[in-house]
């Protein structure tokens, strides 16, 4: 006989057997909401400590229990309030406990609850001091303390139901037709965006491939049925199996139907007095009735519900652990239907008149059936020599053709230099004595006697400005000044220019013409003979292309070698090999801090000369001192709490408050503030301008960043007017080689941007990370160069000890494609691995191999690692290889100018974007893009508008245009300079007749510059394989099926579109295919920030590689052989003609690369013109079934 008491006893025993936990449940822990529904400070602090709490909880339980997901052990129950949402998180391991969270959105409330749970886990010892995970063995030991051995949870994953549930879900899925796409832009997407970023998603086709289903297994007895219980033994057994049946039923129905309640689909009707008879009507998955009796109403209902649970399990709708399946598994039929739609090839519809034109062209200009696109390797007998490599040597100092000086001319020039030197006496006396001066003879003798010398000089010793002058002085005073031609490299443009100007001033008017500089977009070379040329490392690398042995150069000084940027490490490889070609050349490596013995060993044990520096006293303040000074005592506890963590978040308000405090109470003098990047610079600048208000005229706020042209950065060296305080906001660009004389205060955020490359995802990540101790020393030194100063470090003293001594060399943490290409230009006979193994720190062989493979994929290298004809052209263009390829193809496809603008804007963003105005910038970009679906064409229109207003010569019009379109004038000037430089590069690569043709609308190279689809297609051809296919439907990691959402698929896997690209919020996509330049990794997700919709026929016709065709004589499919991202279908004639058109375009590219483009025979030019006109018309036509609309959820 069944009784409620025996039922409760059995249920308690069952739970103890399952969990070994006492029956009483702990009271829920609540994350209290602040008044008004906002998140309280305590809640924010929890989320700062646990920024990704749901991931962390899943990881702990997953590792402890050996399962791939923890959905069964973490159950989120949602409650909608009037102003906010409440979530109760039920935790089933290691003990049963509940926590609550609140938020304006569902995901916010879930994260609050999860963060509170993380705090519990940490208190229980399940997380380390830095919230790190333990290994599985340790979790087993910890679990025993709770009476919950992990072994009892070590169960295999539940088997997926062996059937399709088409009839179980009444909701129908409406895909957008063949090739079509639907997407919800409604509330669900907005609320779940953060969930997507935190937990990841899987597209429908991937999910289906992961589920090993037997689709032929029939549904077991899914017809409606009624169970009249004459004895309740079956019900008692069912209740033992399902101790909480009503909860389980509700959860199953809610998950399967995506509803917040199960009341409408699960209804009880109970009658009787002494014996209660309960009838449960279940309307899901089909109408079913279950009847049970009991002494009380609750008992009868529980029995009926248990019978229902038993039935659902027999249908495969409950897993082997008596838990609900995922939402996706309940909707497997819809998933399969949608998956079939996604896999179906898209139909090609080419108008008949265009097909006839293609046939006519191919009949007139047939492509030989045996013709196969070659690898385009450079051959001496079938290609015009390209570039200056095959011509006369270039003078590294002046850039003119190199001709050695005749002996008589050398004597005359040396005598002239000696006379000029003697006349400059008073100017030299005015120069201040520097710590390096007493070591003059030691340094000069070492340089004279040894081919390589390392000079280690502390900050302020004068090595950068004085050693080049000392070399020139010795040569001139010994009567051999004409033989002294020194190239001094600097890591940054601003330091090359400023140091050259400083040295020129110190040498005086008579020798000023002997000092010059050369940086990207700006050059002022010195006169030859007795010359000092300051340049960036990249400039010297290009000079080595045209003069591999540096004939005519007496010394190369590599300054700031300790920074270990990738170009400097590459230069050292070349200079080491250069010693055999030019033994007279003297190499000087100068370093402020660093492992100088390492450089000495690299160059065979060369001497290291240490020069002490001079620094005025600098008083240092650390975070705890700064917070006390600012009266921010409430921050002290928080910062102490996070002291042991590696969090690199910068509080811009704190930076602003500190600068204002220094201004109000500190000593007079300039303030130099080191910030990680451009966004932080703009953020602090805007905050300062808002705080200063009407008094802004008393301050000179100057940003310093590589995005800003040189002419706009020179103001930092100028003395401000009396009563005006200079505030310089800079990245680490101002750390070395640049001295701003009036700086008294340095604010050091302790952070900088560092590029890191993920070999697995092949994605770069620009991360904000802690600087090294060497960086801290350099930054502090900027305050004590010319007077006593103060350094304010926005990190605690304890953080300084945890910082690494030196930065990781850039060559070990960045993509290597450009470096491998440079290696092939300088030493083509060596393999990439062989060449880069000679670096001071050689990169990972796998990283080098990946770079080689990518260059082979884009057609720059052949299988033997030789430059192809395309690679030979790319060698002249100073930008990333894929962007350079796009430029080369644009010259061939006669749409050059817009591609030059796009590449320049991808190098320097023209928009004045900041953390505060990102949404406004995105709106402007969308307007500029019109209906092109392209961030890149938005760049083109922005620059075109700027060029137009410049012609008006009306200042107010220019300012209005900049303000309305949120454009940044210095960046636009830089972009203009880049376009000019690229034009010169293209001319050097024999792709145009003269540089001015590149920007001339009437030139042949711009004949199709107005054809937007062609421009986007050519950009895609250069960036390929950077191609995205938009797919409908996704499944979250938690198993929720979202049919009206989209995923973005690349060759490497799924990515996300960043909010900054216009295609993220587009209400209509004309094409399912997007191209992009760069993907970046942030918080574990891979994002694309710039994208363009591309015509599917452009993808088919313009990409490299082979295509695969299946033809039954009537219909045919064509796809890319190296990717599953494009499958097209059409009638056999259309597919055949498109394949031949593709081959004709490949032949055109090959011909154009094998000779000077402007010198092609007129007949070939005519053929190419007809072909391009045909291509433009084809891409101008309608997309047909490629048209894609994003629709809102019903």
Curated annotation (Swiss-Prot):
<keyword id="KW-0963">Cytoplasm</keyword>
<keyword id="KW-1135">Mitochondrion nucleoid</keyword>
<dbReference type="InterPro" id="IPR001650">
    <property type="entry name" value="Helicase_C-like"/>
</dbReference>
<keyword id="KW-0378">Hydrolase</keyword>
<dbReference type="InterPro" id="IPR011545">
    <property type="entry name" value="DEAD/DEAH_box_helicase_dom"/>
</dbReference>
<comment type="similarity">
    <text>Belongs to the DEAD box helicase family. DEAH subfamily.</text>
</comment>
<dbReference type="GO" id="GO:0005524">
    <property type="term" value="F:ATP binding"/>
</dbReference>
<feature type="modified residue" description="Phosphoserine">
    <location>
        <position position="226"/>
    </location>
</feature>
<keyword id="KW-0496">Mitochondrion</keyword>
<dbReference type="GO" id="GO:1902775">
    <property type="term" value="P:mitochondrial large ribosomal subunit assembly"/>
</dbReference>
<dbReference type="GO" id="GO:0003723">
    <property type="term" value="F:RNA binding"/>
</dbReference>
<feature type="modified residue" description="Phosphoserine">
    <location>
        <position position="6"/>
    </location>
</feature>
<dbReference type="Pfam" id="PF07717">
    <property type="entry name" value="OB_NTP_bind"/>
</dbReference>
<keyword id="KW-0347">Helicase</keyword>
<dbReference type="GO" id="GO:0005737">
    <property type="term" value="C:cytoplasm"/>
</dbReference>
<dbReference type="GO" id="GO:0035770">
    <property type="term" value="C:ribonucleoprotein granule"/>
</dbReference>
<dbReference type="GO" id="GO:0002151">
    <property type="term" value="F:G-quadruplex RNA binding"/>
</dbReference>
<feature type="region of interest" description="Disordered">
    <location>
        <begin position="150"/>
        <end position="199"/>
    </location>
</feature>
<dbReference type="GO" id="GO:0005634">
    <property type="term" value="C:nucleus"/>
</dbReference>
<dbReference type="GO" id="GO:0007417">
    <property type="term" value="P:central nervous system development"/>
</dbReference>
<keyword id="KW-0690">Ribosome biogenesis</keyword>
<feature type="binding site">
    <location>
        <begin position="457"/>
        <end position="464"/>
    </location>
    <ligand>
        <name>ATP</name>
    </ligand>
</feature>
<feature type="region of interest" description="Disordered">
    <location>
        <begin position="1"/>
        <end position="27"/>
    </location>
</feature>
<feature type="compositionally biased region" description="Basic and acidic residues">
    <location>
        <begin position="1"/>
        <end position="10"/>
    </location>
</feature>
<keyword id="KW-0694">RNA-binding</keyword>
<comment type="function">
    <text>RNA-dependent helicase. Plays an important role in the assembly of the mitochondrial large ribosomal subunit. Required for optimal function of the zinc-finger antiviral protein ZC3HAV1. Associates with mitochondrial DNA. Involved in nervous system development and differentiation through its involvement in the up-regulation of a number of genes which are required for neurogenesis, including GSC, NCAM1, neurogenin, and NEUROD.</text>
</comment>
<dbReference type="GO" id="GO:0003682">
    <property type="term" value="F:chromatin binding"/>
</dbReference>
<dbReference type="GO" id="GO:0003678">
    <property type="term" value="F:DNA helicase activity"/>
</dbReference>
<feature type="domain" description="DRBM">
    <location>
        <begin position="53"/>
        <end position="121"/>
    </location>
</feature>
<dbReference type="InterPro" id="IPR007502">
    <property type="entry name" value="Helicase-assoc_dom"/>
</dbReference>
<keyword id="KW-0597">Phosphoprotein</keyword>
<dbReference type="GO" id="GO:0005739">
    <property type="term" value="C:mitochondrion"/>
</dbReference>
<dbReference type="InterPro" id="IPR002464">
    <property type="entry name" value="DNA/RNA_helicase_DEAH_CS"/>
</dbReference>
<feature type="compositionally biased region" description="Acidic residues">
    <location>
        <begin position="188"/>
        <end position="199"/>
    </location>
</feature>
<dbReference type="GO" id="GO:0042645">
    <property type="term" value="C:mitochondrial nucleoid"/>
</dbReference>
<feature type="short sequence motif" description="DEAH box">
    <location>
        <begin position="559"/>
        <end position="562"/>
    </location>
</feature>
<dbReference type="Pfam" id="PF00271">
    <property type="entry name" value="Helicase_C"/>
</dbReference>
<comment type="subunit">
    <text>Identified in a complex with TFAM and SSBP1. Interacts (via N-terminus) with ZC3HAV1 (via N-terminal domain) in an RNA-independent manner. Found in a complex with GRSF1, DDX28, FASTKD2 and FASTKD5.</text>
</comment>
<dbReference type="InterPro" id="IPR027417">
    <property type="entry name" value="P-loop_NTPase"/>
</dbReference>
<dbReference type="InterPro" id="IPR056755">
    <property type="entry name" value="DSRM_2"/>
</dbReference>
<dbReference type="Pfam" id="PF24995">
    <property type="entry name" value="DSRM_2"/>
</dbReference>
<dbReference type="GO" id="GO:0016887">
    <property type="term" value="F:ATP hydrolysis activity"/>
</dbReference>
